[in-house]
């Protein structure tokens, strides 16, 4: 086999696997230029590379919320750096995962990971492959899907930078209202949808703090209760969606905005890239010193 034939096989292997030039060259050399065996070699080598990176922390990446027909999904795909989250391979993977999730049913992350995409790889296999080809740990972290009933509408919002996404499910037919509240959720990050969801322990703790207020001192019991109620409502507006002033029309609460538009809040969900992941603190001076000693 001459050099041009070898170069042609390397080119073909790169097109098939999307692997780097040196990896394809090595795969063909290791398999005596058998294309099928070289593909298998790259797959196994990719799994080994991914396994080596499995202990790394992937806290960057992108989130996305999307709607197709009567289905909606929200998911997070992580990388180790924001730079990688902007490259074409990562963005293509986001597109493929989004399409696969919205087209298929899943009840858990395990079932979501095993959904097949258009390239005949499962989501888990695709992220493993991406880890090998990109060179960073790529992690499909979480996902949720809604399949809507006839009287339901859902609003989806993904911030332009891809770091925040939200879904808001309502009983009603007004898609614009649902999307507007989804945008509100992304911006204001409420902890609870309604006051009924706030743990009683948290309510009692707030009341105990408010009772220390000088504004209550010397007031009759009835007036104290009125002031206390006002303080509590103001506090709830900080972290309860329906109590919050609506960002597009602050004279209305979100609850009032929904009622005015014949919509009833059913469920909300908001993802932010990396939330809850403990990032490793890097001491660059120590790291450089350690490298110099090697």
UniProtKB/Swiss-Prot annotation:
One of its GO terms (molecular function) is translation elongation factor activity. Keywords: Cytoplasm, Elongation factor, Protein biosynthesis. InterPro entries: EF-Ts_dimer_sf (IPR036402), Transl_elong_EFTs/EF1B (IPR001816), Transl_elong_EFTs/EF1B_dimer (IPR014039), Transl_elong_Ts_CS (IPR018101), UBA-like_sf (IPR009060). GO terms for cellular component: cytoplasm. Belongs to the EF-Ts family. Associates with the EF-Tu.GDP complex and induces the exchange of GDP to GTP. It remains bound to the aminoacyl-tRNA.EF-Tu.GTP complex up to the GTP hydrolysis stage on the ribosome. This is Elongation factor Ts. It comes from Mycoplasmopsis pulmonis (strain UAB CTIP) (Mycoplasma pulmonis).
